């Protein structure tokens, strides 16, 4: 392989590697309940994201960034769903390092089911 081609490939991989944002988590929410969900809060204990009006049988992807304070210890996420006042703790992060997977969250009338993907 020519040196010029090696340089192009190396530049591509380095730019890809450094452009990856591993400072947050992706969550996919699916409303499987019989009605519209008024609001949802997902938090890591420091930062939170608020989602309004998730309609019946609809899906929404949201991204929670770790920006206010990078945790220096282990922790977990939690979700609150209104108006049902459902709350569930789930997942983990270690020393503020975000896991490499995401979460599917299924919201039902009286329960929350969470799967890693």
Please give the residue ranges for each predicted region.
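Sec-dependent bacterial lipoprotein signal peptides
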Residues: 1-20
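Bacterial lipoprotein signal-peptidase II cleavage site
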Residues: 21-26
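Asparagine-centered strand-capping/turn motif at beta-strand->loop junctions
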Residues: 27-33
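Post-signal-peptide N-terminal segment of Sec-exported extracytoplasmic proteins
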Residues: 39-75
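Short, aromatic- and glycine-rich surface loops/edge beta-strands on solvent-exposed regions
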Residues: 75-81
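A short, solvent-exposed loop/turn motif at the edges and junctions
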Residues: 81-89
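Extracellular beta-sheet/turn segments enriched in Thr/Pro/Gly and aliphatic residues
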Residues: 88-117
């Amino acid at each position: 392989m020519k040196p010029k081609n090696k340089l192009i490939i190396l530049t591509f991989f380095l730019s890809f590697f450094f452009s990856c944002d591993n400072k947050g988590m992706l969550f996919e929410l699916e409303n499987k309940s019989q009605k519209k969900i008024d609001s949802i809060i997902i938090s890591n204990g420091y930062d939170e994201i608020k989602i309004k009006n998730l309609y019946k049988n609809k899906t929404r992807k949201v991204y929670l960034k770790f920006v206010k304070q990078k945790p220096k210890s282990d922790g977990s996420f939690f979700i609150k769903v209104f108006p049902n006042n459902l709350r569930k703790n789930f997942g983990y992060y270690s020393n503020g390092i975000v896991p490499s997977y995401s979460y599917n969250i299924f919201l039902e009338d009286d329960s929350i089911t969470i799967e890693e993907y």
